[in-house]
């Protein structure tokens, strides 16, 4: 990790610092968010409504936010995202007496996630390409930063909630200020292409962007690869608690298990960083994800151990996919492309959750996991072969 950080440019280090403080502030009260809202008097239906509003706002605004970033400046949009997140947490932490206020806070929360997508990250990628640096180093360092901040935030939030309650949000607000300052210190050179785009209207930007996407099959296959990844991600994140509860694991250990799953990201990133990846190895990892978990058919208890193994293998693949995305993204529409990928993931997530829920109803959660993981492996294998063919 230290080696990767040292290799980064000044701007890349500042972006990593901004992401670290921003994600730490976001996750600090995140582990106890449901408990906090319940204690404020909201019921589970209202909490589900808040989550739905968050997802809808993030999905609807993500692609437009990428276009805004390409048109008006990625640094400015990133800083706007931090300010929006600051306002959201301020309302949640200190003005949570009324449901309408919290609902508006979740609208801001979803908007902040959308605004952040493909902003300073795209600037760093362009800077690395200009200086002919290895994008993998930045991608790995960024993954380490996000994983560590999530783990630290989740642990500290769980430990300090009983003593601090809503004051945890005050710490988050201070961390957001640090993230804003780190982003403000970034200085990126403006290319001639950026100056030309500033003179174009939003409609023209959309028209040209879709023409670029239509004429490039690798970009389309890259979007499909990220959409296929939701066949693994959504069942894992949304249903692992159910799987472990049915396996006899007490709920009181779920906080520790959550942190352990975050650590799986770190392990997967380490493996990817240390291994020289070939297309053949990546395909082996993709198939192993489903094949290894399929052994849980032998014993339900075995699934509790095999799921983390599958998660580690997935993160190895996903890290590789993230690097590929940064390499093939069109320079003139990088933020728009990153946001379009995020939008496709959001839509695919809804489909994945529907498939998972249907499978659980008919075959049970263990077999549902196996079905979804094999669907992920098959779809990813086909899309990856098509991507390599037209690359």
Residue ranges and their predicted role:
Residues 83-97, 287-301:
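C-terminal ends and interior cores of transmembrane alpha-helices
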Residues 169-172, 176, 180-199, 385-391:
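Helix-loop junctions on the cytosolic side of multi-pass membrane transporters
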Residues 20, 88, 99-116, 302-318:
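Hydrophobic core of transmembrane alpha-helices in multi-pass small-molecule transporters
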Residues 34-35, 39, 150-171, 245-247, ...:
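Transmembrane alpha-helix termini and helix-breaking/packing motifs in multi-pass membrane transporters
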Residues 2-60, 216-259:
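Helix-loop boundary and gating motifs at the non-cytosolic
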């Amino acid at each position: 990790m230290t080696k990767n950080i040292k290799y980064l440019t000044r701007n890349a280090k500042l972006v990593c610092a901004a992401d670290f403080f921003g994600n730490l502030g976001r996750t600090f009260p995140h582990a106890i968010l449901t408990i906090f809202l319940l204690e404020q008097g909201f019921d589970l239906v209202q909490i589900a409504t808040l989550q739905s509003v968050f997802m809808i706002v993030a999905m609807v605004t993500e692609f437009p936010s990428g276009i805004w970033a390409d048109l008006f400046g990625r640094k400015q949009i990133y800083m706007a995202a931090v300010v929006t997140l600051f306002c959201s947490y301020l309302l949640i932490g200190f003005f949570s007496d009324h449901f309408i206020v919290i609902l508006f806070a979740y609208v801001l929360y979803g908007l902040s996630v959308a605004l952040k997508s493909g902003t300073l990250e795209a600037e760093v990628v362009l800077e690395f390409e200009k200086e002919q640096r290895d994008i993998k180093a930045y991608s790995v360092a960024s993954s380490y930063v996000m994983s560590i901040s999530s783990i630290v935030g989740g642990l500290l939030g769980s430990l300090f909630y009983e003593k601090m309650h809503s004051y945890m949000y005050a710490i988050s607000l201070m961390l957001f200020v640090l993230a804003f300052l780190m982003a403000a210190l970034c200085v990126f050179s403006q290319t001639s292409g950026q100056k030309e785009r500033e003179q174009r209207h939003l409609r023209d930007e959309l028209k040209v962007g879709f023409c670029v996407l239509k004429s490039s099959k690798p970009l389309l296959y890259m979007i499909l690869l990220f959409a296929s990844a939701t066949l693994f991600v959504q069942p894992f994140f949304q249903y692992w608690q159910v799987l472990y509860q049915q396996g006899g694991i007490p709920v009181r250990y779920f906080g520790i298990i959550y942190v352990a799953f975050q650590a799986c990201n770190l392990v997967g990133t380490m493996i990817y960083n240390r291994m020289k990846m070939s297309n053949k190895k990546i395909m082996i990892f993709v198939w192993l994800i489903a094949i290894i978990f399929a052994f849980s058919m032998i014993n339900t208890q075995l699934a509790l151990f095999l799921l983390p193994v599958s998660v580690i293998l997935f993160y190895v693949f996903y890290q590789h996919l993230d690097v590929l995305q940064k390499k093939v993204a069109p320079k003139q529409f990088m933020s728009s492309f990153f946001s379009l990928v995020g939008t496709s993931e959001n839509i695919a997530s809804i489909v994945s959750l529907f498939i998972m829920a249907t499978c659980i109803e008919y075959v049970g959660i263990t077999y549902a996991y196996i079905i979804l993981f094999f669907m992920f492996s098959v779809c990813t294998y086909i899309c990856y072969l098509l991507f390599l063919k037209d690359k």
